[in-house]
Amino acid sequence: EALHTGDMTQAAALLGRPYRISGHVVHGRKLGRELGFRTLNLRFRHSKPAATGIFVVQVHGLGEHAIAGVASLGVRPSLDADDVNGGRVLLETHCLDWPQPMADALTGGEAYGKIIAVDLLHKLHDERKYDGLDALIAGIKQDCQDARAHLATHANNAFNAPHTQTQRPTTLDRI
C-alpha cells in the first residue's frame, strides 16, 4: 500500500531500507541524451512495479559511492502516447551529478549491460503528459531542481557510504 500511494518513507520503514529496483542498463531511444538529460534505463519484462511516478533516487553500482538522481518509473505518457512502448514500464534514471568516468562510459556505450541498483527515496509526483518536448524539458528541469531541494533538506548518509553489492540469499541462507 505504501508503495502504491508513493509513501516512500513508510515503505522504507516497512522494508528496513529504501525500495530498490535493480537490473541491467539497456539501450533506449537516446532521446534523453538529445534533450540534455542522459538516462540509465531499466526495463521490466514481466512484472510491473508497485510504485510509479517521478522519484528522487540514489543510484548504486556506478562507482564507490551512491549517486543522487531523479527517475521516471512508468510508461512515459508524453513520449509514448500512442503506446509505441507496448505499455511496458521503464525506469529511466538521470544522475544529477554524473561522475566523469561514468559520463565518458555512457558516451562510449560502456554502461550498457552494467548492473545498477536504484533506491526510490521520495516521490515527487505522478507521471505527467506534457504538450511537446519543450514542456517536457521544462518539467524535467523542475524535477531536477525539486530533487536537489529535497536532498538538501533530507540528508542521507548513504551517499557517503561505500557501495556494497548485495547478494541474493541462497537456499543455505534460508535453512
Annotated model-derived regions:
Residues 28-175:
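Phosphate/ribose-recognition catalytic cores of enzymes acting on nucleotide-derived substrates
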